[in-house]
Structure formats: C-alpha cells, structure tokens
C-alpha cells in the first residue's frame, strides 16, 4: 500500500498544535494525560475510575432469569458527583458472579421506591434493566 512521504517539518508543526488542543480539552474534562514519544499513540490518558461493590444476599448461584432488574440503592448517586466515573458491581452471595454497570447508565429515570423490611414505605433504588449492564463470572 502506498502512502505519502513523511515530512518531518510539517509533522512537527501540526502534531504539536493538535496535541496541545486535545490535552487542553482532556484537562477540562478532568482526564490527566502525558505525552510519551515512542511512535505509538500521541497521548496517554489516565482515567480515574472508582469501583463500588454490593452483595445481593438473595442471589445464590446463577442469576435468576425471572429477575429483569438489578437494584442499587439510589443513595449511591452521591458517589457519581462531579462526573466521577464509578463502576458498580452487584455480587451474588458467594461472590462468584457479578452484575457490572457503569455510572453512565445510572439514569434518574430508573429510580423507584421499593418497599422492604427496613423502609416499608419504600426506599429509593435504581431499578436497572439487566440489559444496561453485564453479568461477569468471578471464578478463576
């Protein structure tokens, strides 16, 4: 396959401007970056990601196919303030299976009151359709 020749002066002039513009944009989004010249990708980004875990005591073994939602307490919304990236993991009782969902999928439209023994009038939960996340086996 043919491609244009590499013009070092043009490359140096343009790539520096492009890297500067993208790094400024990523900085505004709170994504730290570093430039490492190794003829690989131009910019290496470091995303800060947090993980929140819960155990669903009533979930034994494989996921019950009759359960069409996974519940995560709505009070966990505080963990996502200021655009913080959080990956939520809801595990079965023996921690061999998990449901993983990204904070970007945790929409307010999923918040609903769910009565339980601790809050009979209904505690607020994200009632997430299983399609918005993924089931992961944690067995080695």
Task: Report each predicted region and the residues it spans.
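Nucleic-acid endonuclease domains
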Residues: 1-50, 55-140
């Amino acid at each position: 396959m043919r491609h244009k020749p590499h013009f070092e002066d043009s490359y140096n002039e343009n790539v520096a401007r492009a890297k500067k513009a993208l790094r400024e944009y990523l900085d505004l989004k709170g994504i730290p970056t570093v430039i490492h010249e190794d003829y690989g990708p131009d910019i290496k980004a470091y995303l800060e990601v947090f993980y929140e875990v819960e155990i669903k005591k009533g979930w034994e073994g494989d996921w019950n196919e009759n359960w069409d939602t996974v519940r995560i307490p709505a009070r966990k919304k505080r963990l996502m303030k200021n655009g913080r990236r959080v990956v939520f993991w809801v595990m079965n009782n023996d921690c061999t299976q998990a449901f993983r969902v990204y904070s970007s999928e945790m929409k307010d439209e999923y918040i609903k009151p769910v009565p339980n023994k601790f809050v009979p009038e209904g505690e607020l939960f994200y009632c997430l359709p299983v399609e918005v996340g993924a089931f992961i086996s944690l067995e080695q």
